Amino acid sequence: MEPPTSHVTNAFSDSDSASVEEGDADADADVEALRRLSDNLAAAFRSPEDFAFLADARIAVPGGGGGGGDLRVHRCVLSARSPFLRGVFARRAAAAAGGGGEDGSERLELRELLGGGGEEVEVGYEALRLVLDYLYSGRVGDLPKAACLCVDEDCAHVGCHPAVAFMAQVLFAASTFQVAELTNLFQRRLLDVLDKVEVDNLLLILSVANLCNKSCMKLLERCLDMVVRSNLDMITLEKSLPPDVIKQIIDARLSLGLISPENKGFPNKHVRRIHRALDSDDVELVRMLLTEGQTNLDDAFALHYAVEHCDSKITTELLDLALADVNHRNPRGYTVLHIAARRREPKIIVSLLTKGARPADVTFDGRKAVQISKRLTKQGDYFGVTEEGKPSPKDRLCIEILEQAERRDPQLGEASVSLAMAGESLRGRLLYLENRVALARIMFPMEARVAMDIAQVDGTLEFNLGSGANPPPERQRTTVDLNESPFIMKEEHLARMTALSKTVELGKRFFPRCSNVLDKIMDDETDPVSLGRDTSAEKRKRFHDLQDVLQKAFHEDKEENDRSGLSSSSSSTSIGAIRPRR
């Protein structure tokens, strides 16, 4: 017979086991209830069309995402989750004399929400979506690949620019909205990858950490130490960071003996004078300073400076001086083309390549210009579909230009069969070039603008391709009639033909994909009159598609001209004067 105590012990053991099981079941039920609550609240944000009748505010993001830049939100949810947003909505409610949208909802500009920091850190559409989604669901979703992955196939996508920039944007928005848990999470994520981040990208993280201030002190201190010990020059730092941070860097470098007390890491006064002249867009002053013999463009790294910090026209004017080595390296081992790849300005890259910049040159760590550009470009920008007639993304254009330059196989010869057939007919050649470049402007506006800027087309007189229609007064001094009979080659004709020919050559060299499309269209003998029964359905469809594109472009140009106060009475077969680059 078992002792009574054993029964008591077993009874308690069974009771404890049952209690644990019941506790686990209760915990699981609580977790499931919280998960459903999270999903239900998230649905109100993730399915804006289904919950549009409940949304009472919209946040407008510059540039937007896809079809629009407005994100529909619910003030009660955001106010409950973010003290900052609660204060914003409370102040606007107190002020309350309107401010609603057409549907009665309140519209807030993201830059206004982010305050002064919004001018320094541009929070993108996808980054804001992630922050708002967290406020609704309490969970951090997967990072969007289109916004966080670069184009370089060899990249691990841990410390590349798109990944770093996205995390920095989320961190800044979360800190501004006073969402402590999300701020801490992304601060930890950035701290974990800092050692893998390219030194130039440290400046972005440091800027954001400085704006977040007390909420990101660990990140701020770590970034500051890494920048102090880096090879980033003082000019780059001065252009990227606020004065108080610059002072901390100078003091730290002085204490470590990394710079001398005399110049504190800055270039001498003669170089600084050249830089100030470039900042003032005064290339003539640069020329005068060079005559003093105190320095030269290479020693001053003037081309590097202009490419990184000045308007593209300054780079072109400096190159035209022919006084600098276009393949000169700065102390960090970057050629001018490497700097241009970082800036991602197609016109500057093409200008350098036409002057002999070598795309195969590598940095000290083994990267070519095209690899630099790829590491900076988001997959969403590169692989996204561009609507016909709309500008191509600059990032993608830069990569295509650099890849084509590396192939070293630009298309040679005449622009196309049609131009070759024009033979000695100067009028025919001019008409062909005008039509080709005009078509390029409609179908590939960004590529055409780059080539035309390099060729300086806007410095020549446009030809009137109409059939006797008089151009408006605003254009009479900027057009030349090609319909004069007999046609006589004049100086302005020659200048125009030279510029247009160079435009076509640049297009074939750097934009072969676009040039091939234009070749097929210009060489196509399809004519509206010849579209009879013998015309293939495919050819007929192609003609009508092209006709739709041209008609759409014409109507858009006409509306824009009407808004600008220009006369809309010019012939529909005439292309308007090219606007000067702003």
From Swiss-Prot:
Disordered, as annotated region: 1-27, 525-544, 551-582
CDD domains per record: BTB_POZ_NPR_plant
MF-aspect GO terms: zinc ion binding
- SMART domains (UniProt xref): ANK, BTB
Q: Which gene encodes it?
A: NPR1
In this chain, salicylate is annotated as bound at: R436
Q: Which family does it belong to?
A: Belongs to the plant 'ANKYRIN-BTB/POZ' family. 'NPR1-like' subfamily.
Give start-end positions of Low complexity composition bias.
564-574
- What does the record's free text say on domains? The BTB/POZ domain mediates the interaction with some component of ubiquitin ligase complexes.
Residue ranges annotated as compositionally biased, kind Basic and acidic residues, are 553-563
Q: In which pathway does it act?
A: Protein modification; protein ubiquitination
* Principal subcellular localisation of the protein: cytoplasm
Which locations, inside or outside the cell, does it occupy? Cytoplasm; Nucleus; Nucleus, Nuclear body
SUPFAM superfamilies according to UniProt? Ankyrin repeat, POZ domain
Organism expressing this protein natively: Oryza sativa subsp. indica (Rice)
Query: What lineage does UniProt assign to this protein's organism?
Result: Eukaryota, Viridiplantae, Streptophyta, Embryophyta, Tracheophyta
Q: Detail which positions bind Zn(2+).
A: C150, C155, H157, C160
- Region (Salicylic acid-binding core (SBC)): which ranges? 391-526
The protein, known as: BTB/POZ domain and ankyrin repeat-containing protein NPR1
Q: Could you list this entry's UniProt keywords, alphabetically sorted.
A: ANK repeat, Cytoplasm, Disulfide bond, Metal-binding, Nucleus, Plant defense, Repeat, Ubl conjugation pathway, Zinc, Zinc-finger
GO CC annotation, single: nuclear body
Superkingdom of this protein's organism: Eukaryota
Polar residues bias (residue ranges): 1-12
Q: Which residues form the BTB domain?
A: 55-140
